[in-house]
């Protein structure tokens, strides 16, 4: 199976909703319809870089209703998490893609783990306006400054 090969090679690990103990009630109810209705030809691309121990930029801004591709690149020497549980609850997710290696189509995520020298692309439509915390859940990384904010306007 292609997705198993990706995980086995250490290219990408996704923490999916059901493994985190969350329920679908917490997430955008009509996510599939919102993704389908979006005009992906107008998609905006936003880049964020992960390094020891930061997100650059540390504040990400998105407009509700606009389709996005968030390119998450780990230019560090350690693996890092892009953990933004409340943000993931506020968006309609289309898919996560790992370079040319494959993609995972799942409606719900709580975190993305990106290995050194690798990248992930998150395709989504922001829905619920607000300010959401972002941090790396690896012990000590947030304390060293690996935190940020995601705003949906």
Regions found by a protein language model. Name each.
Residues 1-11:
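Bacterial N-terminal signal peptides that target proteins for export
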Residues 18-21:
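C-terminal motif of bacterial Sec signal peptides marking the signal peptidase cleavage site
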Residues 23-29, 54, 106-153:
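Extracellular/periplasmic metallocenter environments
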Residues 24-41:
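A eukaryote-biased signal for short, well-structured alpha-helical docking elements
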Residues 38-67:
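N-terminal edge beta-strand
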Residues 58-83, 119-128, 152:
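Beta-strand cores of secreted/periplasmic/IMS beta-sandwich domains, seen most often
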Residues 88-99:
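Short aromatic-acidic-glycine turn motif
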Residues 99-107:
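Short beta-strand and strand-turn-strand segments in soluble, beta-rich domains
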